[in-house]
Amino acid sequence: METTSLQRKFPEWMSMQSQRCATEEKACVQKSVLEDNLPFLEFPGSIVYSYEASDCSFLSEDISMRLSDGDVVGFDMEWPPIYKPGKRSRVAVIQLCVSESKCYLFHISSMSVFPQGLKMLLENKSIKKAGVGIEGDQWKLLRDFDVKLESFVELTDVANEKLKCAETWSLNGLVKHVLGKQLLKDKSIRCSNWSNFPLTEDQKLYAATDAYAGLIIYQKLGNLGDTAQVFALNKAEENLPLEMKKQLNSISEEMRDLANRFPVTCRNLETLQRVPVILKSISENLCSLRKVICGPTNTETRLKPGSSFNLLSSEDSAAAGEKEKQIGKHSTFAKIKEEPWDPELDSLVKQEEVDVFRNQVKQEKGESENEIEDNLLREDMERTCVIPSISENELQDLEQQAKEEKYNDVSHQLSEHLSPNDDENDSSYIIESDEDLEMEMLKSLENLNSDVVEPTHSTWLEMGTNGRLPPEEEDGHGNEAIKEEQEEEDHLLPEPNAKQINCLKTYFGHSSFKPVQWKVIHSVLEERRDNVVVMATGYGKSLCFQYPPVYTGKIGIVISPLISLMEDQVLQLELSNVPACLLGSAQSKNILGDVKLGKYRVIYITPEFCSGNLDLLQQLDSSIGITLIAVDEAHCISEWGHDFRSSFRMLGSLKTALPLVPVIALSATASSSIREDIISCLNLKDPQITCTGFDRPNLYLEVGRKTGNILQDLKPFLVRKASSAWEFEGPTIIYCPSRKMTEQVTAELGKLNLACRTYHAGMKISERKDVHHRFLRDEIQCVVATVAFGMGINKADIRKVIHYGAPKEMESYYQEIGRAGRDGLQSSCHLLWAPADFNTSRNLLIEIHDEKFRLYKLKMMVKMEKYLHSSQCRRRIILSHFEDKCLQKASLDIMGTEKCCDNCRPRLNHCLTANNSEDASQDFGPQAFQLLSAVDILQEKFGIGIPILFLRGSNSQRLPDKYRGHRLFGAGKEQAESWWKTLSHHLIAEGFLVEVPKENKYIKTCSLTKKGRKWLGEASSQSPPSLLLQANEEMFPRKVLLPSSNPVSPETTQHSSNQNPAGLTTKQSNLERTHSYKVPEKVSSGTNIPKKSAVMPSPGTSSSPLEPAISAQELDARTGLYARLVEARQKHANKMDVPPAILATNKVLLDMAKMRPTTVENMKQIDGVSEGKAALLAPLLEVIKHFCQVTSVQTDLLSSAKPHKEQEKSQEMEKKDCSLPQSVAVTYTLFQEKKMPLHSIAENRLLPLTAAGMHLAQAVKAGYPLDMERAGLTPETWKIIMDVIRNPPINSDMYKVKLIRMLVPENLDTYLIHMAIEILQSGSDSRTQPPCDSSRKRRFPSSAESCESCKESKEAVTETKASSSESKRKLPEWFAKGNVPSADTGSSSSMAKTKKKGLFS
């Protein structure tokens, strides 16, 4: 087809391509000999590489604080090349070089929002930013991020002014002719994808060197006096050849003389090391000199000072145009590299300047326009990495777009970008969420796993295949299980010696290590082994990395992403006389000098500081010695974690730099996959993996529904003060899913005059620090926050955590509720949610293009939804996500009790079963068939809403009329729209449906996956179709439990007398309510902020469950003293300007109220009070002395002593009664009082049968009556166990429990063995059981006796086991006597004769 006549006329710059190709070789000029083999310029200092918005803002503020007005920083930017027409790329990296020893690289592309701190720095007019083509950078930043670069210094203008010329300088040209060096312009680095995470070492050095070059060129040009200094080398080349020859001859003679004098051996090692370095330098310079003298010259390229010339070679010209900023400065067409002929704002604004410059060049050099175009084109094309092909239609569109934008958009964009309200830009399309912690993980992972991934319709349809869906394990168990460490001592580990215990008590206030703590510490001190430590919040994982350096006297490095948490821990260590510091880029030289002198034991650093200062760590290890390196919050390393931080991925270099230093990775939430990722990323060598249980028994869990009225939802958690004002019962955090919601909740609570503040990542750092500071010091009682708050808070007395909106996954939810009750006292966690809360999460999931990661996040969200809908024990659901199916003993004492969760409390009170119908699988086959068929009938063109309208027979105009005649139209009208939407969510989660995003991220269509289409085909032949799904309350409604009126203390709810657990008096049941009181308001000048509510837990219940009951007088004394201690601590903390909880935790105050020490030495006996803390808490001793003097109560009640008046009463109580732990008491009551079968109790309380049986064995040990037959201890079972115990090899040694278990048949439960042993041990003092005689038969009690004994046992429990013989249970003869003939021992008289002293008294 002939197209010549129809071929449109191309612009001149494009039609010259063929001419350029033909003359390219001839046009190539040779570089000046002065530029041959110039040494490369490299940045010699440390590079700080930051990839998180919060860290970037923090570092930027540090830079602003350290720099003075008028200071200059080297500035540069990088962005990836674009290979498609019409596309544009955003700035990926911003470089700031503040000195010759420090350069900051901010990887903006890994951040979801532009860091506020960096924006303030770039817009700071008092700090100058120097670079080449920097004006183009200004427009680029303005266009990409709405950031206006202020006080920029164009080095081209400075150089032309100083050198008295009018040159078009590139950065490389300035480096060559000002510094006598050259930049390494490797195309593979320069044109690499700067958005990919992480940057390579070559990319880092390249980027840092560019910014460094800008800084030192500015400094060099500032010191120049005139042009002669720059061109002295050129004049020497022309005028001093004879002098140079003389110098060469002289140097050669000196070299020969040195060679003759050189000794055969070097006595000094330093000499031996330095000589090769000097010789290498001389050799390199000699080689360069040879090329300069012997190399060819070209008169056309010889430098002529003072004339208008181009100092750049062709290669340099390419380097000069490597970025859009230089292209925008010097040429319109150099935009080809990023956007082929895309007339952006910067190029349009600079067009006029380019034209003026071209005319000036033509006038000066007399060149024709074609020659100018040719030269410029040659430079532009050499700058370009890839020349894309442009079609005819695309060219027309682009040119038309250029004409329209040039005249219509420039002024509009200028006025918009320069608006003074740009900080308050409201972009309605932005999802209201905490971007710093929500989107960074998604974007960083996208860059980490793949390059550019194009989402296509077919790709999304492939995501729902059978093998790729998240597996659904029963009860949430599966590969993510973690077995917890047993709390028993590891007998293979040596006990800590006296010196180690003394160090522990002196600096940390504890008298012993917890077993898992000692396991980790011993591994570090003795084995020098890497460790992965997963410990529940509040267990004490910080001691694992703080103790070793204190004990060894060396240094411990702690890496944490949380600045505020590190500051609090440094303060806490300093209060205990442990020298510690936070080392960052903004630290003074004095602190760094003290670090090098070994004056600090624990040094906290950020991941960015660590990666940029490995040489400092190596220096510290060689000079002082590093005991360990701890990586706190290590789950941030894993891309699968809920709080992925890309900066942690760079910490793998630690083991390379310091291979002999043990590394400890610590986290409170890490499943098996996350642990493996941690080990891999940190390059740990054969690490010891230690995991404790995840249970937090002091946390009460509750879930409720939002009503839409914020005050109505939150008022149940508030209490009225005496002044009729409202307040929370203790410090409270309210988590909201978006910034907008935090502000709404704060505004509503403000109507009640509550002392609450907002906290989210959109606030300035100074504002966030103020909220954090005031919350720690109890100046505000409540913080309404996004997930940006809390992870770095060191406040142990948070009593309540409320989620006003559904969390996205179990890990983050566990982490957030874990901030409550770290002092070990009772706290509560409440979650109020609505189904719409998951809509934003689903939209975010759709945007994830990595299939594996998307399905993983979907699986996590589905687990969270099941948790919210479930009627099972919420504690069990959470723990089953982290732990193994056994759910070890840490959970047994609380699970299933009224202190556990909102599901256990009503089930316990009303004897309900745990397996309610909505948690069971239901057959939704017919409905699923209808919904999938509707999606297929509508040709997968709509979202899920239209198929639901179709099934419900809606008359909505959104449904096309042509579908209304289909036989399925209206087939599902019996179900509500919300029901169908819930079913669709289940089908999406199970992989039958998939939502496919369109161009607009809020528009998505619903399509069948391969799995869904296969099932639909198979179901069409079934009648009816079957599909089992787990129903929830949306699909199987049940009564919703609203938040309790006093949810903070579920144990305070008064139950009727018949519901009290055995052994617990009414007075004991109501201790929480009795000791809950409010501290007087804190006096504050100018504010009316209420003092935090000090909720006093029962002092009796805080200790061992077996602690004897205390008198009312003692309880009153403890309560009153505790209140005064809280108030005194607050005043003392205010004077010291430290958080009260850091000065002394509530638990310490409770112990002080019980022990009432009056001397510093006695105060040291309290657990958690170190020597340093004891001295600081001395003012509290006066409060104790004054209170005890006024109330006449005894003081200095150390752990070995008891109140004198209660000692005899306590001893008497121990003889009569021994209280049961609450969980044991609940099991005993249900079994003995309510006659529930043991297997039903175990099922109802979600306990293993053996655990429930062991509860009964403990009741037997405590002396409580028990129906042995119903418990399973039948005469036959008793005989089998007794035969094993009394015969060899046991020989009645009841301490050989393990051997007994081996010899007893496996079908007998272990608890029956323990029960039999307890019976024997309780009666061993009053009778001797003869060996079993198989010819004799024991008589089992009759049913009448059993009924009588049950009745008597009930009375015994109610009366708390009165000591009279009338209330004692009548024992069966087969327990009381071992060898009575069954035929002749039926009379009641013989029974009376065999009756002995009660076994259960």
Curated annotation (Swiss-Prot):
Residues binding Zn(2+) 3, per UniProt: C873, C900, C901, C904
SMART domains, sorted: 35EXOc (SM00474), DEXDc (SM00487), HELICc (SM00490), HRDC (SM00341), RQC (SM00956)
Entry superkingdom: Eukaryota
Record comment: activity regulation: Zinc ions stimulate the exonuclease activity.
Regions of compositional bias (Polar residues) in chain numbering: 1043-1069, 1323-1332, 1382-1392
GO biological process, one term: DNA recombination
Region (Disordered): 401-427, 464-492, 1041-1106, 1323-1401
Biased composition annotated in UniProt, kind: Basic and acidic residues: 1070-1081, 1348-1358
Outcome of swapping R190A: Strongly reduced exonuclease activity
Catalytic activity: Couples ATP hydrolysis with the unwinding of duplex DNA by translocating in the 3'-5' direction; ATP + H2O = ADP + phosphate + H(+)
Domain (3'-5' exonuclease): residue spans on this chain: 51-223
Disulfide bonds: none
Gene Ontology MF terms in the entry: 3'-5' DNA helicase activity; 3'-5' exonuclease activity; 3'-flap-structured DNA binding; 8-hydroxy-2'-deoxyguanosine DNA binding; ATP binding; ATP hydrolysis activity; bubble DNA binding; DNA helicase activity
Cell location: Nucleus, Nucleolus; Nucleus; Nucleus, Nucleoplasm; Chromosome
Cofactor remark: Binds 2 zinc ions in the exonuclease domain. Has high activity with manganese and zinc ions, and no activity with Mg(2+) (in vitro).
Chain positions recorded as Zn(2+) 2 binding sites: D76
Known function: Multifunctional enzyme that has magnesium and ATP-dependent 3'-5' DNA-helicase activity. Has 3'->5' exonuclease activity on forked dsDNA. Has no nuclease activity towards single-stranded DNA or blunt-ended double-stranded DNA. Binds preferentially to DNA substrates containing alternate secondary structures, such as replication forks and Holliday junctions. May play an important role in the dissociation of joint DNA molecules that can arise as products of homologous recombination, at stalled replication forks or during DNA repair.
UniProt record similarity statement: Belongs to the helicase family. RecQ subfamily.
UniProt protein name: Bifunctional 3'-5' exonuclease/ATP-dependent helicase WRN
Organism field: Mus musculus (Mouse)
Gene name per UniProt: Wrn
